[in-house]
Amino acid sequence: MSVLTSFRKRFIEMREDIILMLNGEIERIPPVKSDLTLMNWLRNNKNLTGTKEGCAEGDCGACTVVIGKYDYTSKGVGWHAVNSCILFLPMLDGCSIRTVEGLASHAGELHPVQNAFVENHASQCGFCTPGFVMSLYAGWCQSRNLDNAAIDDLFAGNLCRCTGYRPIKQAASHINNILFEERDTDYRDEEEKFIVENLEREELSIKVKHLDHQIRFDAPRCLQSFQEILHTHNPLILAGGTDIGLWVTKKHMELFHFLYLGNVKELNQFEENEEGFLIGAAITHEVAMQKMADHFKSLQELWRRFGSEQVRAIGTVVG
């Protein structure tokens, strides 16, 4: 046993169960195969079938859900629309997830975002509707001013095969008329409390047997732990999964050991100094765009055309 491995076993607490919040309820999930996607877990394990599979590659937006995740650069919780078809479930440890089924009140009263779609007749065949609703809900959570350009950005990652975009955009404009101070945040307060408290939990380290192989997923919280795993094993480094997710969903590759860097505090730092910018390996395109746009005006339009909001929310600049 190496000195580093001995240190890890003695001083770094680890666990194998995934802990997350789903539609306001805490879920404790026993070890799962590391490449189980969030979408498949929602549909097959939780029977939340509003989340649809359209393309299985993060392009169509039918699988869109909203996640709350801690942002080390802002030192708060950020809310993002993401493609659940290419996100692996263990990546969501410590996060809060909202699906379309979780928007209405317990009494069955529709969320204002859902009402906007109803009142503006913004659904035709309905297959894409949950994804559009969740993208608009992400804009609601972010308290964004939804002018025409912002609406286009918000829905850039959602496709409607019926081409019913006009009433969909009208629904978004309708939401913009609701004052920010009138938008409910009470239940999100509980979600944010859960996310922050999770930062103090043990590191996630999942090991399961599959086809005579051990499948492993490590999600260290500190750089020392990350380096130890990297140097003592031969893991595949996983950041946002916007490429690796397709290796699983499209190429059907069997991947045996993920080393996830999304929880490593030191790799989630963005610093500006006299020499330029120091961009951590876990910094997403969305965060980098917010930090650098004022310095590089010409990059603003380029970044808007890079992927979609769902992709920029998880895809990393460093790769």
Briefly describe each language-model feature range.
Residues 53-56, 235-245:
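Aspartyl protease active-site motif detector
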Residues 143, 177-179, 251-260, 293-297:
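A glycine- and small-aliphatic-rich helix-loop capping segment at beta-alpha/alpha-beta transitions
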Residues 209-210, 214-235, 252, 311, ...:
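Noncatalytic alpha-helical scaffold of FAD-dependent oxidoreductases
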Residues 233, 244-249, 256, 263-268, ...:
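Acidic, glycine-rich loop-and-beta core segments that form the ion-binding/anion-interacting portion
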